[in-house]
Amino acid sequence: MLNLPFKALADPTRRKIILLLKERDLTAGEIAEQFEITKPSISHHLNVLKQAMLVTDERKGQNIYYSLNTTVFQEVVKWFFNATHVNEGGLGDVKNAKDK
């Protein structure tokens, strides 16, 4: 389940989009204003973030607003927390973690 979010977060442009959306919901045009890349490139990055379920979109009138999906971010943070803390289970936990 977490492969797509990690892959999406590997790109610096997508990480910057995430930081922008942390502040408030934005349209694709508002996001594009913060970059020196084409609108189709921004659209591609937004689609990757949507496929990874890190971002959702909602139509309001003629605009589509993008927002963070905090549920998936909670799962990513939970994975990092579990991966960085040693448990009593030892290496058995590593075998279980790779299956998730």
Question: What kind of feature is each model-predicted range?
Answer:
Residues 50-60, 67:
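Beta-hairpin "wing" of winged helix-turn-helix
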